[in-house]
Amino acid sequence: MSFAFDLISDLHVETWDQFDWHHQATSPVCIVAGDIARDRDIVTRTLKHLGQCYQAVFYIDGNDEHYSHLEDLGSSYSDLVRRIKRIPNVVYLQDNVVIVNGVAILGTNGWFGFDFDLGIDASQVDQWCQENYYMSATATKNIARLSNTDASYMIDSVQKLQRHTDVRKIVMVTHTVPDPALIAHDIDLDGSMKFNVMGNRLMMQAMAADTENKIHTWCFGHYHGSVDQTRSGIRFVNNCRGRQHTKYSRHVYHPQRIVIDF
């Protein structure tokens, strides 16, 4: 038996001249791993468009969707839920596990706890974010809190899915990078403050909860370089488009088709 899906993320639609996904689909369903745009109306329009291109679109938000709402992330999430539930063929993965043909799709943003590299002081990274990204102390506190709750949600959900006999495999979806080792090769990031806002190291605790070895693939975004690695039998893969006119961006961009055989 097999299950196939297209993976896309970090479209940053507002930085490109246009986004037209007609005739681009290579699978019946699509996973979008966050950072569609900062403008909520663009996010909504893009998801509507993708919903016309696929039988189903499974979406998780990125940090960019909350760019103007970091002071009140609770309200920000409520607004996303309200908008997305009206869109045909689009499913918001936050707090919503989807099971398709024996495959569970489990997703959350993930955020970052400012401690991705334990050798870099998290409090200094927190302050650096406030100064460089013009975040308030309230915003960074909210982000750090959600990084913990998102990790707990994924760990607890993986544990529960071990007992579901109808779930053969699990696809994990986070916007941020789940393991520092996946991007440790990047000399532009290594040892930098920015490295510590790339991912959530707590996510790897979900591996210990996977006692039946159901986790098959872990999809993520946020890091605009290319990653496709297998670690401990699990495929870690991203497919980010990136912002136009930046070092890591793709003018020619296609979905990454992923097939799970079991």
Regions picked out by a protein language model, each given a short descriptive name:
Residues 106-171, 176-194:
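Active-site-proximal loop/helix segment associated with metal-binding centers of metalloenzymes
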Residues 2, 99, 190, 195-215, ...:
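Binuclear metal-dependent phosphoesterase catalytic core
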Residues 56-129:
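A basic- and aromatic-enriched beta-loop-alpha substructure that forms the phosphate/nucleotide-
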Residues 1-6, 97-107, 168-169, 230-235:
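Beta-strand-turn-beta hairpins that frame and shape the catalytic cleft
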Residues 12-17, 37-42, 64-71, 97-99, ...:
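Active-site environment of divalent metal-dependent phosphoester hydrolases
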Residues 1-60, 64-76:
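N-terminal active-site segment of His-dependent metallophosphoesterases
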